[in-house]
Design a protein with these regions (language model features):
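Aromatic- and Gly/Pro-enriched helix-to-coil junctions and flexible linker segments
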Residues: 4-5, 17-136
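Sec-dependent signal peptide hydrophobic core
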Residues: 5-12
């Protein structure tokens, strides 16, 4: 009888613990500065760095810091946190810019891979979290 009760206790404890624990979804992981540092920044540096990192800020857009990225460039804001469909950056890397001035990005280079675009969309949808310090 004690073994049965002990077994029931173990099962009950496992079920109770399981109700508090849940897997972290990909979307939740994307809302952290670490996701930006590990996944997004390398994509941006590889594909956008020549024109929008370091001392180059074509179109007035610098992707170096959180503040400058969220500020946008001469044409306005490029990222709407939580809304990839209305984020100009997402539209341009998908080559879906406005018909009168499409600005496909990166210019004169192959289109960013679908997998990398999906990472950027996921990051923007999750709120576009970035570290405050670009060195992080």
């Amino acid at each position: 009888m004690r073994r049965v009760l002990a077994g029931v206790g173990v099962v009950a404890a496992a079920l109770l613990a399981g109700s508090w624990l849940r897997p972290v979804t990909a979307q939740e992981g994307a809302n952290t500065p670490a996701f930006y540092t590990e996944k997004v920044r390398p994509i941006l540096q590889t594909n956008c760095g020549k024109c929008h990192f370091d001392v180059n800020h074509k179109g007035g857009l610098s992707l170096m810091t959180k503040a400058s990225t969220l500020k946008g460039g001469r044409d306005g804001v490029v990222i709407v946190p939580g809304d990839p469909a209305n984020s100009v950056l997402v539209k341009l890397i998908r080559h879906e810019g406005p018909p009168d001035d499409p600005k496909p990005m990166p210019p004169k280079s192959p289109m960013i891979s679908d997998a990398d675009i999906a990472v950027i969309e996921q990051w923007v949808k999750a709120g576009a979290a970035m570290p405050n310090d670009p060195a992080q």
